[in-house]
Curated annotation (Swiss-Prot):
The gene is rsmA. S-adenosyl-L-methionine binds at residues 25, 27, 52, 73, 99, 118. Pfam families: RrnaAD (PF00398). This is Ribosomal RNA small subunit methyltransferase A. Its EC number is 2.1.1.182. The keyword RNA-binding applies. Specifically dimethylates two adjacent adenosines (A1518 and A1519) in the loop of a conserved hairpin near the 3'-end of 16S rRNA in the 30S particle. May play a critical role in biogenesis of 30S subunits. InterPro entries: KsgA/Erm (IPR001737), rRNA_Ade_diMease-like_C (IPR023165), rRNA_Ade_Mease_Trfase_CS (IPR020596), rRNA_Ade_methylase_Trfase_N (IPR020598), rRNA_adenine_dimethylase (IPR011530), SAM-dependent_MTases_sf (IPR029063). It is found in: Cytoplasm. It catalyses: adenosine(1518)/adenosine(1519) in 16S rRNA + 4 S-adenosyl-L-methionine = N(6)-dimethyladenosine(1518)/N(6)-dimethyladenosine(1519) in 16S rRNA + 4 S-adenosyl-L-homocysteine + 4 H(+). Keywords: Cytoplasm, Methyltransferase, RNA-binding, rRNA processing, S-adenosyl-L-methionine, Transferase. It comes from Novosphingobium aromaticivorans (strain ATCC 700278 / DSM 12444 / CCUG 56034 / CIP 105152 / NBRC 16084 / F199). Belongs to the class I-like SAM-binding methyltransferase superfamily. rRNA adenine N(6)-methyltransferase family. RsmA subfamily. Its main location: cytoplasm.
C-alpha cells in the first residue's frame, strides 16, 4: 500500500481551506473515508467518478480500494494535492479541472462507472437529479454513493404520508433503490457544517414499462409544486391529468404527499404519448 502523508498535513502544506462559496467541507477521518469507499462494494478495477474531491480524502480511499478514479475539481487550489495523489497511484487517477454540472460523464468513460462523492452542498441535488433523469435506462452508472445533508438524504428515501416525502423521493425511487448507508456527524467535517450528513447509496432498478421520464417529471413538478393543494387544483394545468385520476380511481381531493410512487408512475403512464 502506498504510504501517504496525513491529509491534514497535505491541506496545511498547500494552504487549503474549505470555502463556503464552493460548498466545501473536508473530511479527514481516514477510517470513515475507507468505510464510505466500501459502500459500493468491490471497486478494484472499476471506473469511479468523483465530484469535488477537494484535497483528496475520499479519493485516497477509492484509490486504496483499487478503483480507477476520474475526479472533477473546479477549485484550482486543490489541483497540486490531487496531482501528488496521481503520482502516488500511477494510472489510477485522472483529474479534470472544471464544473461537474457542465460535464457529461458519458464522455469520460468507455464503459460503466460508479459515482462516489462528498458532493459540494450547493450543487449536490442538481447533480443527483441529473443522474437520475436520463431517458435511457438502465443508465451507464452502476451505483451512486453520495454525501448529502441528512435532511436531503431523508427526502430521497422518504415514504408517502411523511413530511419529507416529495418530488425528490418519487424521482429517486421510481426506477432505482436508494438507501441511507450511514449517518455522519457534523463534527467529522472541517469546518463543521451546521447540520448532520448522511451517505446515500443508489442502484438502478427495472424501468417501469410505458412511462416517459419526462412526463413523470412534469407530473411530480405540478403535484408537489403546490403540495398543500388538492390534486384537482395542482394537476388541473396538466392536460389529461384529471381524467387519469378518474381512470385510476384516485380521489382528486387527495394531496400529492398521500400518493405512492406507483401512483405517480401510473398517472405518468396514462399521460405518456
Amino acid at each position: 500500500m502506498t504510504d501517504l502523508p496525513p491529509l491534514r498535513d497535505v491541506v496545511n502544506r498547500h494552504g487549503l481551506y474549505a470555502t463556503k462559496a464552493l460548498g466545501q467541507n473536508f473530511l479527514f477521518d481516514e477510517q470513515l473515508l475507507d468505510r464510505i469507499a466500501r459502500v459500493p462494494g468491490k471497486l478494484k478495477g472499476e471506473n469511479v467518478l468523483e465530484v469535488g474531491p477537494g484535497p483528496g480524502g475520499l479519493t485516497r480511499a477509492l484509490l486504496r480500494a483499487g478503483a480507477k478514479v476520474t475526479a472533477i475539481e473546479m477549485d484550482k487550489r486543490c489541483l497540486p494535492a490531487l496531482a501528488e495523489l496521481a503520482d502516488a497511484f500511477p494510472g489510477q487517477l485522472t483529474v479534470i479541472e472544471g464544473d461537474a454540472t457542465k460535464i457529461a460523464p458519458e464522455t469520460l468513460f468507455d464503459g460503466p462507472w460508479h459515482v462516489a462523492a462528498n458532493l459540494p452542498y450547493n450543487v449536490g441535488t442538481q447533480l443527483f437529479t441529473g443522474w437520475l433523469s436520463g431517458q435511457d435506462w438502465p443508465p451507464q452508472w452502476k451505483s451512486l454513493t453520495l454525501m448529502f445533508q441528512l435532511e436531503v438524504a431523508e427526502r430521497i428515501v422518504a415514504q408517502p404520508g411523511t413530511d419529507a416525502y416529495g418530488r425528490l423521493a418519487v424521482l429517486a425511487q421510481w426506477r432505482a433503490t436508494p438507501r441511507i448507508a450511514t449517518r455522519v456527524h457534523r463534527s467529522a467535517f472541517t469546518p463543521p457544517p451546521k447540520v448532520m450528513s448522511a451517505i446515500i447509496h443508489v442502484e438502478p432498478a427495472a424501468m417501469p414499462e410505458g412511462v416517459s421520464a419526462r412526463m413523470l417529471e412534469r407530473v411530480t413538478e405540478a403535484a408537489f409544486g403546490q403540495r398543500r393543494k388538492m390534486l384537482r387544483q395542482s394537476l388541473k394545468g396538466l392536460p389529461g391529468a384529471l381524467d387519469a385520476l378518474e381512470t385510476l380511481g384516485i380521489d382528486p381531493q387527495r394531496r400529492a404527499e398521500t400518493l405512492s410512487v406507483e401512483d405517480f408512475v401510473a398517472i405518468a403512464r396514462l399521460l405518456t404519448k
